[in-house]
């Protein structure tokens, strides 16, 4: 398992270094014009927890994404919550679309960001997760997510979350709207996206290896140490 997990970490590092090579540091870089997220995005906003909290969640239905699901560069589907149609109706303004970038905006996991998996389009987010929906004719979601998860932008987001003497980390909607990101040429963005798509194929294989080895370990452990 360790070798496969190490391979996954290497792939993440490869994508990060390729990003810096192509676009530079997203906080310091001045080759490209900078644009506010308010200008770039067609949607910036978080949702709410249904009345009744955890007890109100269902065993199936419409997915409700929480901060525990959002990790840097990947989505964790374990412990995914579900709500019913009536609860979802109240959160229609945060209906997820294919290509949305997710960003944790409060708590210990603040600043974590990933792309929404396509199969969760139509779901909702709670108050700890913001939808960041960029105009794909100006910036590809994959590029925006790579900006958010770069080391320097992570530091920038974390610093922002601790400003104004807040008792807990938080990035407000006003903060988000005024944040700027570099806007490289779309042709260069497509080249980067093609590179990441190739890396993702290797990532998928490595992930499958980890899961197979875990299943093998679990079955052996059950056989030798079980009842």
Which ranges hold each PLM region?
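A short glycine-rich beta-alpha junction/loop motif
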Residues: 122-130, 139-142, 162-190
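Short loop segments at secondary-structure junctions
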Residues: 119, 134-137
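Short, ligand-facing micro-motifs at secondary-structure edges
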Residues: 71-82, 101-104, 108-126, 142-146, ...
